[in-house]
Structure formats: C-alpha cells, structure tokens
C-alpha cells in the first residue's frame, strides 16, 4: 500500500475501558461515562485488549476500596511509562474524597474528576493531552442531573433509571452523603420519559435507583439544569406519596414488563408503597430493604431513625399484601460498641425476617464519618467470628427459602453473565420476577412446533417459563424442558449486538476526541 493510499484511509478512533467498583449507582454512572466517551469519538476496547484510555469509577464505602484502586493503578504504571500517549482517569466517590491525593499516590494519572461533574470527562482528557499535564476537577455541587448525559447501556433487556441523586440521611457509618451531596429528585415526567425511551428500544425491565427511593419527592428539580447558583435548586413542596405514584405510573407503560427499585429506607417506608407494589402488575414481588443491625441500641448509634420492631412490622405488611415477595437486606457486623447482646439481637431479627439473601459486611472504619471516631472499635477477630455466625445463619435460611421454590413454575428473563458455570453445565441463567437467580436447561419449549425449535434458540432478553428442580443458597436449578419460550425485541437486540442509548448529550460533538492516529497495515510497515 502506498503512503498516499494509507493516508486516505479513515482515522482510527482511540479506545476506552471503564472499570467499575461499588454500587448500582456507580454501574449506571459508568454507562454514562461510556456514552460520553463514545459521543466524543472514542470506541469501546475489545475484551482483553489494552485500551488507549482507562477510566476507574471508584467506590469509597469500604477501606479495601482504596487498596484495590491504588493497586490497580500501580499495575498500569509500567504501561504508562512505555506508552505515554495512553491516558488514565480516576472518578467516582474515592476521587471526590481523595482529590489531589490521587496524584500524590499515583502521579502517572492524567485526570481526576468527582461525582458531581462526570460530564467533564471528555474535556478533561482533551485538556490533559493538549497541556501534557494532569487535570484535577472536583465540583462541590451537582453541575447537571446525570440522566441528561448520554448513556451507553450495558444490557439490551434491563436498564437502570435514576430517580434521585444524593442523600439527606446522616448514618454515622456512611460517607456517601458527603460525596454525593443532598438529595435532589428528578421530576416524574422526566423519569417516565427515560423509561419510555428504553422500552421503545426493547428493554423489558427497569430498576429505579436512588440512595433512598422512598424519600422521592423531597426536592424536585425545577429544571434538569442547575440555576446560576449551583448550590440551589428551585424546588416545590414535598410530595410524600410521590414514589408510590411513580410506581403506579410505571404500571401504565405498555411493554414494560418488570419494575424493580433500590434501595428504600425503613424509616420512611409507607403503606402506600406496599399497596402500589401489590396492585401494579409489573412491579416485581421483591424488596431490598437494608436492616444494618437488629439491635435498637446500635441502630440509634448508627442514626438509622427506626427500630427493629418497625422494621419487622414493614416486612409483615409486605408479606401480607404480597405473599410470595422475596425480601433481601444489608447487614453490618462489628459496629463500634456492638456487644454480644447487640449481635444476638441481629441474629434474632434475621431469623424472624427470613431473608431470601443478604449482603453482609464487616464494619469498615471510614475516615470522615462519625463512627470512625467512636469508642469501642472492636478487634478484628471478634468481628470476624460474629460475621461467620451470621453468614452461617443466613446461608441456612437462604437454602430453606430456596428449597421451598422446588416444584414451582417460574417466569425467567434470560440473562447473560449470571452463571459462571453455564458453559460447563450446558445451562443458561435468568432472573425470576422475585429476583432469584435460576440456572436452567435451555431445551426446546413444549409449546413450540418441531419446525420452529431449531430456530428458536433461547437468547438473553427472551422470556421463558420452567419448573424448579433443585436449590442452593444462592440460586435455583431448573433442569426440565422449558414450558414456554417467548422471543422478544430485547433478545433480537442482544443477538444483533445493539445497546440502548439514552440522554441528550452535551451539545458539543467531538469534545475530547483526540487527534486521530494514522492507520498502519502490514503493507505500510
């Protein structure tokens, strides 16, 4: 190939990779980061390939988050030395917390950005490349509601939808409010419009996201953009029924088959939400409600604003209205000052609650939180021993609850990446309406004509029904023939490699796109 012909070839876009740590909010923020970069001219790096830009979207909830980030950054240092044109960006909660300290610990990083200004990433990358100097930009308040940003969705069949950002609670163990700011809620019309956009692209399931979803309505944004003073939102009086109304409105969206939400706070959980869950067919019979501790004394020290009796009362009312609801929770073991009596109270509430599963954590001291300075910090050995006892109890309950599902017929939304052993076992995986993970045999459905069975391969995004044949603490098994198989637009999109996109973009196409690199071919070397 001649040099003239080589120069005539289209430029090669630089590639990116986003590495995500932490909660569902971070996962969704990473979709936005991907959307921003793609709008700016980057393309996603192939699996296993070295990306030109590596973005870390970090978590600051637990102490090992720091170690994980800086360990991974150190692994990239040799590559950065040999390929100075590659770029490394660090964003998210840990970046918001550490700020300039990121560069002190990892001076080869090119960009540091916070939770309030993720839309700045393409511009910061361009500025760092142009100036050949690291860029640190941490905003103190939200600059634009994140959902206005473009998002490159990971799933063709299920989508995250933020209904709020920030949190007004003051839990003594939690650093999130200081990093994410006060709660600001999206207007219902904006939330529903985003859901409709996803459904129009084939999405069957949405999960409504917020730090405290049942506080929704506390501070509606008057506009998706901040006014001149970034610390102020024009707001309207709180609507305490707003979240239940939003759930019912989701039920009126044609084509939306499943609605989930995470996470509600027990202190503000009201019966109108239970009624909306029970009376809205597409709201899934699943509730994730953090308990944290079963001890009233520890709950008070945590500033959780509820007590064990209130929590158990909510569970009783949910199960009365939705008998098949699967209830899951979060638990912290070893909070400062926790006695054996306090821990036993947690075991008692767990035993009474019969959670289908629980995310259980050993207390992690976070600088900047009130709990970090409390007396009575427990020895690691004590915390570890209690943690093991709690795990043993919850594993037994989870197994018993799953064994009760054997023989039931479940509808599954077929998923990808849920079963680590699917290839070895010749199974696929999917989620039941109550959120349980089911590994199933993908044999032809009994209701399909023979002529269609070869064509109707089960795909992620399709919907099947099957009968549960076995159980383990964390999943169900369904090894019989499928009872039904419904091909969906989501399955078509997944098979075609299409991903839904949402967001209005920044209005500045190409910002952050680096100068194109020339194509090299074997003939041009």
From Swiss-Prot:
Listed GO CC annotations: cytosol
Cofactor: [4Fe-4S] cluster
This protein's record includes keyword Transferase: yes
MTTase N-terminal domain span: 14-130
Compartments (UniProt record): Cytoplasm
Binding sites annotated in the UniProt record for [4Fe-4S] cluster 2: 167, 171, 174
Name of the protein described by the UniProt record: tRNA-2-methylthio-N(6)-dimethylallyladenosine synthase
Organism: Mycobacterium sp. (strain MCS)
């Amino acid at each position: 190939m001649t040099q003239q012909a080589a120069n005539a070839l289209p430029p090669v876009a630089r590639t990116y990779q986003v590495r995500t740590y932490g909660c569902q909010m971070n996962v969704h923020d990473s979709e936005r980061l991907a959307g921003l970069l793609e709008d700016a001219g980057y393309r996603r790096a192939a699996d296993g390939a070295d990306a030109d830009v590596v973005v870390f979207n970090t978590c600051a909830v637990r102490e090992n988050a720091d170690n994980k980030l800086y360990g991974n950054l150190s692994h990239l240092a040799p590559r950065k030395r040999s390929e100075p044109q590659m770029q490394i960006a660090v964003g998210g909660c840990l970046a918001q917390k550490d700020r300039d300290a990121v560069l002190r610990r990892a001076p080869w990083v090119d960009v540091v950005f916070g939770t309030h200004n993720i839309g700045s990433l393409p511009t910061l990358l361009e500025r760092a490349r142009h100036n050949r100097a690291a860029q640190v930009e941490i905003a103190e308040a939200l600059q634009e509601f994140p959902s206005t940003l473009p998002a490159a969705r990971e799933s063709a069949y299920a989508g995250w939808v933020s209904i709020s950002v920030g949190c007004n609670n003051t839990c003594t163990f939690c650093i999130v409010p200081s990093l994410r700011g006060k709660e600001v809620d999206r207007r219902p019309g904006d939330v529903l419009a985003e859901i409709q956009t996803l459904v129009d692209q084939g999405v069957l399931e949405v999960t409504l996201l917020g730090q405290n979803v049942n506080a929704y309505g506390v501070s509606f944004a008057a506009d998706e953009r901040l006014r001149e003073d970034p610390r102020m939102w024009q707001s309207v009086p709180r609507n305490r029924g707003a979240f239940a109304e939003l759930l019912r409105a989701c039920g009126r969206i044609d084509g939306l088959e499943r609605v989930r939400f995470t996470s509600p706070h027990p202190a503000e959980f009201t019966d109108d939400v239970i009624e909306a869950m029970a009376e809205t067919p597409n709201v899934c019979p699943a509730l994730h409600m953090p308990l944290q501790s079963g001890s009233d004394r520890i709950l008070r020290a945590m500033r959780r604003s509820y007590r064990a009796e209130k929590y158990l009362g909510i569970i009783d009312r949910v199960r009365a209205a939705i008998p098949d609801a699967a209830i899951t929770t979060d638990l912290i073991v070893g909070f400062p000052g926790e006695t054996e009596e306090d821990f036993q109270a947690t075991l008692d509430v767990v035993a009474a609650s019969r959670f289908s599963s629980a995310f259980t954590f050993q207390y992690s001291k976070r600088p900047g939180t009130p709990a970090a300075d409390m007396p009575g910090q427990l020895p690691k050995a004590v915390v570890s021993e209690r943690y093991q006892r709690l795990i043993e109890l919850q594993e037994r309950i989870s197994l018993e609850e799953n064994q009760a599902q054997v023989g039931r017929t479940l509808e599954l939304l077929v998923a990808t990446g849920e079963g680590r052993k699917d290839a070895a076992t010749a199974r696929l995986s999917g989620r039941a309406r109550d959120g349980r993970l089911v590994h199933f045999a993908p044999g032809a459905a009994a209701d399909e004509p023979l002529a269609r069975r070869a064509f109707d391969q089960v795909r992620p995004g399709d919907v099947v029904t099957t009968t549960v044949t076995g159980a383990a603490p964390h999943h169900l098994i369904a090894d019989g023939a499928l009872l039904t198989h419904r091909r969906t637009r989501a399955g078509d999109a997944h098979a075609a490699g299409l991903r839904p996109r949402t967001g209005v973009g920044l209005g500045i196409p190409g910002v952050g796109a680096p100068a194109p690199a020339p194509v090299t071919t074997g003939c041009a070397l």
